[in-house]
Structure formats: C-alpha cells, structure tokens
C-alpha cells in the first residue's frame, strides 16, 4: 500500500512562496506533489514519470487562455522546480487530436512553438497524453510493481 505523504502545511509553504498569482500557486502545488511522487522509489525509477497541471494565464494581448505545465526533459521528479515544468498553450495541443496522423517531428515542433518560454526545456514526450486528459492534475508514473507485472509472460492477465 502506498503511504499518503501529503502534508498540508508543507503544501501551503510552497503555495505561499509562489506569490499571489493563482496560476503560480497551482504550479507550486504541482512542484510539491511531483516531489512527493518522485521521492517514492515504488512509483518512479530514476526520476522518471511525468506530472502536469492545467492553469489559466494571460497571453501577450491580455486574453485569458489555458496553459498546461508538464515535466520537462532532463528533470527528475524528486528535485523538480517550477522551471522544470514548462508551460504550453493548451488549445493548439488539443487540436492535434483532430489529425489522422502526426509525425514525431511535427509533434515536437508544435510543442516547441507553443511554449510560453522559448528557452524552456523540451516538454515530456507524453505531453499530448496530459493535454488530452480533462483533469487539472495528471500524474503518470512508472510504478515498479506494475512494470514488473507488465513484463511477465503472465503479466498482461493480471494488470
């Protein structure tokens, strides 16, 4: 059984440090919960897995738009900081669901083109999975017990 390591006072500390902007507070909470996940070796192997949060931010013209912050390449969940969860404009990513096919190169180009900060790390290769799911917070882990089961000959019947 997985122990719940969430601590309300620790979470509040992360949120308080983020300032008054609601999107920054939600991102700070995502950083906190990502670290909890990343520090559990039964849930992640070598810092792997991905987390995301969907927030609202204003674009250059002052329009409120949906943004997804998703773990970037090169960051480990157990030590992640806000820059390790680059923000992307969400609507263009969701439009990709309407395509019959999408090459890896086109996917990466669309993701890079929709980063809020062009110098941010590449977002996870699973960014579209996170974007297509409706949930505000998404956790995608590489849980060791399930990976073991899935790789056994008889595993598929039990996963």
Predicted regions and their residues:
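N-terminal low-complexity or amphipathic/hydrophobic leaders
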Residues: 22-107, 128, 132
